[in-house]
Amino acid sequence: MADPYEFLMCIHNPEEDTLTRNFPIPATPLDQNTKDISLNPDRKTSLRIFRPPTKEPPVTKNKLLPIIIYFHGGGFILFNADSTMNHDFCQSIATHIPALVVSVDYRLAPENRLPAAYDDAVDALNWVKDQGLGKLNNSEVWLKEYGDFSKCFIMGCSSGANVAYHASLRAIEMDLEPAKINGLILHCPFFGSLERTESDSKVINNQDLPLAVRDVMWELALPLGSTRDHVYCNPNIDHDGSSSGNMVGLIERCFVVGFYGDPLIDRQIQLVKMLEEKGVKVETWIEQGGYHGVLCFDPMIRETFLEKLKHFILNDEFIY
């Protein structure tokens, strides 16, 4: 294929390790059912909060809304919470479930290589916790009036699903009370390794996400000097002999969505197998056709997904 940077419409500036992004990314402004909140001013991170169309807060606790902490895709290097495809996807989730969606505008690579996005995810989890405790001077009224802190979920798409996965591992070791994480939701999760899979080889020049582009994304996102067998990329690798592999089994409940038209499908199936082997209760929706990140673009497939997501979220079990 052509130069992957041309495909991405980006220029890497290696001396500063920055990226000039020329990729056209339309953004959606706020409306009455969305708002932007600063998360960490020092890190210049923020949250975009979505609520279902409504005028009055719930009257009783059993009418409160689940809280979904969401991480967008973009190979760790592109897009934001206000990017139109991410905005529309989160708004559809908030409306259909219904739920409050807290979309995290985390730091991008290579300016902020991993684990920066994971650290921002921890900030978001702690922010939700502090909202539940009422510790912040300027408490977010939507969470206070609409949010059920006993029903929180961590969700992501593509590289955002990678962030969600690592955030869920960190959440296990955090005291998040009164927030309780009920499950992990992974849409077309973005993982890799040095070893190629069959689906990698079959669709090297996949028009949506070519192999060379995926490799460049990892080169820009991983810590300098790392390979794709780093634990941030390959979930089958334990980091420095740590207990991260054992921690995976404590997730217990996960919903994985994948499509056979996605060149990453083999990795997603491997992820499901690994989770199940470690004792995680995994629900899957793996369909023929489709492509990487299809739910953010195809409203018809999204409709089917939203019904399945609603079923998963309305399960009353919570994990940690």
From Swiss-Prot:
Q: Which organism is it from?
A: Papaver somniferum (Opium poppy)
Which pathway does it serve? Alkaloid biosynthesis
InterPro entries registered for this protein in UniProt: AB_hydrolase_3, AB_hydrolase_fold, Carboxylest/Gibb_receptor, Lipase_GDXG_HIS_AS
**What is the recorded function of this protein according to its Swiss-Prot or TrEMBL entry?**
Carboxylesterase involved in the biosynthesis of the benzylisoquinoline alkaloid noscapine. Converts 3-O-acetylpapaveroxine to papaveroxine which spontaneously rearranges to narcotine hemiacetal.
Catalytic residues (positions): 158, 262, 292
Question: Which lineage do the record's taxonomy fields give for this organism?
Answer: Eukaryota, Viridiplantae, Streptophyta, Embryophyta, Tracheophyta
Task: Give the motif span (Involved in the stabilization of the negatively charged intermediate by the formation of the oxyanion hole).
Answer: 72-74
Q: Does the keyword Transmembrane helix apply?
A: no
Pfam families to which the protein is assigned, alphabetical: Abhydrolase_3 (PF07859)
Catalytic reactions on record = 3-O-acetylpapaveroxine + H2O = narcotine hemiacetal + acetate + H(+)
Disulfide-bond pairs as recorded? none
Instruction: Output the PROSITE patterns linked to this UniProt entry.
Output: LIPASE_GDXG_HIS
One GO biological process term is: alkaloid metabolic process
The similarity annotation says: Belongs to the 'GDXG' lipolytic enzyme family.
Q: What is its EC number?
A: 3.1.1.105
Q: Which UniProt keywords apply?
A: Alkaloid metabolism, Hydrolase
Official protein name in the record: 3-O-acetylpapaveroxine carboxylesterase CXE1
* Gene Ontology molecular function: any one: hydrolase activity
